[in-house]
From Swiss-Prot:
InterPro entries: Cuticle_C1. This is Cuticle protein 21.3. Keywords: Cuticle, Repeat. One of its GO terms (molecular function) is structural constituent of cuticle. The tetrapeptide (A-A-P-[AV]) repeats found throughout the protein are also present in many proteins constituting the protective envelope of other species. Sequence repeats lie at residues 98-101, 104-107, 116-119, 121-124, 133-136, 154-157, 166-169, 178-181, 184-187, 196-199.
């Protein structure tokens, strides 16, 4: 409330004295963080008086210090790197940031980042072997030896690890050996190395 800045200047009422009074107030956004200065100088035939006062209020700072009671259902987590597997193959690196699930009032933090959003773990970008459902395309090593590009003609393969193999694979370039697929059934691979045998 009020104006952002104002100043007053007043002369003394006594004709025998010479003096002045100055008051200045500057306010921040929303009337917070005020700077108030007051000075008074009076010179009379018998005395000389100088008074100066300066006040600064940092209203935002009081919100970030001290222990605040946490409302029920409020969860905090530290930001960190997570390593996990994804639909696309090898480990997925990402950053998971946990934030309050329920915010009762605005919170301001100094030093660490605060994100006011529910913490939801989403699939992270992964680098490694690709596995796409029906047909599964794989890049990496074939069933036997050597790197190969291949198109799986059998069932979809879902890879949850470093390496996943779907049979059969059509090799383009390097040597790759694959057993023929007889029936179409989904091959699920979980782990560092998993091999999908032909489904009969």
């Amino acid at each position: 409330g009020g104006p952002a800045a104002y100043s007053t200047y007043t002369n003394t009422a006594d004709f025998g004295a010479v003096g002045a009074t100055l008051e200045s107030t500057s306010k921040g956004l929303g009337g917070l963080n005020t700077i108030t200065q007051f000075s008074k100088a009076v010179d009379s035939p018998t005395s000389s008086v100088r008074i100066s006062n300066s006040r600064v209020s940092n209203d935002y700072g009081s919100l970030g210090y001290g222990a605040l009671p946490a409302p029920a259902g409020l969860a905090y987590g530290a930001a960190g790197a997570s390593y996990g597997a994804s639909l696309h193959g090898a480990g997925a690196y990402g950053v998971v940031r946990a934030a309050p699930a329920i915010a009762a009032a605005p919170a301001l933090a100094y030093g660490a980042r605060a994100i006011a959003a529910p913490a939801i773990a989403a699939p992270a970008l992964a680098y490694g072997a690709r596995a796409i459902a029906a047909p599964a395309l794989a890049y990496g090593r074939g069933l036997a030896y050597g790197g190969a590009y291949g198109a799986a003609l059998a069932a979809p393969a879902l890879a949850y690890g470093a390496r996943a193999y779907a049979a059969p694979a059509l090799a383009l370039g390097a040597r790759a050996y694959a057993a023929p697929a007889i029936a179409a059934a989904p091959a699920l691979a979980y782990g560092a190395r998993a091999y999908a045998a032909p489904a009969i």
